[in-house]
C-alpha cells in the first residue's frame, strides 16, 4: 500500500490549513536544524579508543603534611 499523489496533496492541504502558509517555512527550518543537530551528535558518539596504562609511567610522590599551631 503506497501513498499516491492524491494522498500527498490532501496531507499538504491539511498541513497548510492547520499551520498557515507563513508558518510552514519556519517549521521546515526548525526541523532541518533538529535533524542536522541529531546527526552531529550521532557522529560524536563514535567509540573512543581505550588508553592502555603502563606501570612505567607512574611517578612516586611523597606528600608532606605541615601543620601550623595558632
Swiss-Prot record:
Membrane topology summary: Single-pass membrane protein
Family per record: Belongs to the TatA/E family.
Gene Ontology MF terms: protein transmembrane transporter activity
Keywords per UniProt: Cell inner membrane, Cell membrane, Membrane, Protein transport, Translocation, Transmembrane, Transmembrane helix, Transport
Description of how the protein assembles with itself and partners: The Tat system comprises two distinct complexes: a TatABC complex, containing multiple copies of TatA, TatB and TatC subunits, and a separate TatA complex, containing only TatA subunits. Substrates initially bind to the TatABC complex, which probably triggers association of the separate TatA complex to form the active translocon.
NCBIfam families in alphabetical order: tatAE (TIGR01411)
Pfam families assigned: TatA_B_E (PF02416)
GO biological process: protein transport by the Tat complex
InterPro entries reported in the protein's UniProt record: TatA/B/E, TatA/E
Localization per record: Cell inner membrane
Cited function: Part of the twin-arginine translocation (Tat) system that transports large folded proteins containing a characteristic twin-arginine motif in their signal peptide across membranes. TatA could form the protein-conducting channel of the Tat system.
Protein name: Sec-independent protein translocase protein TatA
Entry's transmembrane regions: 1-21
Cell membrane in keyword set: yes
Keyword Amino-acid biosynthesis part of the UniProt annotation: no
Organism domain of life: Bacteria
GO cellular component: TAT protein transport complex
Amino acid at each position: 500500500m503506497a501513498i499516491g499523489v492524491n494522498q500527498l496533496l490532501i496531507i499538504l492541504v491539511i498541513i497548510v490549513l492547520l499551520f498557515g502558509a507563513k508558518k510552514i517555512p519556519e517549521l521546515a527550518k526548525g526541523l532541518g536544524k533538529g535533524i542536522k543537530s541529531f546527526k552531529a551528535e550521532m557522529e560524536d558518539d563514535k567509540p573512543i579508543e581505550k588508553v592502555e596504562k603502563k606501570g612505567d609511567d607512574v611517578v612516586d610522590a611523597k606528600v608532606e603534611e605541615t601543620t601550623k599551631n595558632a
